[in-house]
Regions:
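Flexible, membrane-associating and regulatory peripheral segments of lipid-active enzymes
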Residues: 1-54, 60-82, 106-109, 231
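Short, function-defining helix-loop hinge/capping sites that tune catalysis or transport
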Residues: 26, 65, 92, 152, ...
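Hydrophobic alpha-helical segments, principally membrane-spanning helices and signal/leader peptides
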Residues: 42-43, 129, 177, 199, ...
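A broad structural signal for short, well-ordered beta-strand segments within beta-sheet-rich domains
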Residues: 49, 137, 203-204
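Serine-dependent carboxylesterase/thioesterase catalytic core
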Residues: 53-64, 68, 72-182, 194-195
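C-terminal catalytic-base region of ester-bond hydrolases, centering on the histidine
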Residues: 180-232
Length: 232
């Protein structure tokens, strides 16, 4: 019996699993975007006695995409700060990092843990590696972040999505800035339809989840557990 004959059923099962995760992923994303369209009061989250957290959503996401995570962490006593200047996070990484740094300084936040999704992790690393205010950051927990870029980026229709090419100047600079990696926790699924290269980051604490997806992994209990580990 050939090797292909032995392993082909496994490949079909893996494909079926990945397609199921993909469908569940977009259902989660659609539900989150509908929720994010409603009113929100970020200032209500900014109080608490414990270590401060700053939310960094992904591209085309507002802070409310991360609201369930923010509410859970705020309930544990952490002030959760929102960078409203990011909007839906379509600006270049360097510009967005400047806005995050400005918030850290304006609110005099120190010993901060960044909580990031996707592009937000690149913005957070840009702050940590290149902004003077990066010294105010204790750690970052980044979920489904394309630290090595995504090969799909070059096929995208907008400059904001094509910015994730591995050959992009900002992406190359971030890749070369390995000194801050030890302060980063990279959490990612077993399958990510947006990042075929994966989100493993050399020198970081890498946490591979059993489930898959790019969006729905935000609801995995390990995400909150890793933020708590970094912040408490």
């Amino acid at each position: 019996m050939s090797t292909d004959a032995v392993f082909r059923p496994h490949r079909w099962r893996d494909l079926a699993r990945d397609l199921r995760w993909w469908g569940q992923d977009y259902l989660y994303a659609a539900t989150a975007q509908v929720r994010a369209a409603g009113p929100g009061r970020p200032d209500d989250l900014a109080s608490g006695p414990h270590r401060p957290l700053v939310l960094l959503p992904g591209i085309y996401e507002t802070w409310r995409f991360l609201e369930p995570l923010a509410n859970a962490l705020h309930a544990r006593g952490h002030p959760v700060h929102v960078v409203t200047g990011l909007g839906s996070n379509r600006r270049p990484i360097v510009e967005s990092a400047g806005r995050v740094a400005e918030l850290l300084v304006d609110r005099d936040l120190d010993d901060v843990v960044l909580v990031a999704h996707s592009k937000g992790g690149l913005i957070g690393k840009q702050v940590m590696a290149f902004e003077p205010a990066g010294a105010r950051v204790r750690a970052m927990v980044a979920v489904a972040t394309p630290f090595g870029g995504s090969r799909y980026s070059r096929l995208m229709p907008t400059p904001s999505l094509r910015a994730f090419r591995s050959g992009d100047a900002t992406m190359r600079a971030l890749g070369a800035s390995a000194a801050v990696n030890a302060r980063i926790v990279s959490v990612y699924g077993a399958f990510d339809p947006h990042i075929p290269e994966g989100s493993e980051l050399a020198g970081a604490r890498n946490v591979r989840l059993e489930g898959g997806g790019h969006f729905r992994v935000l609801a995995d209990p390990r995400v909150i557990a890793e933020v708590i580990r970094a912040a408490e």
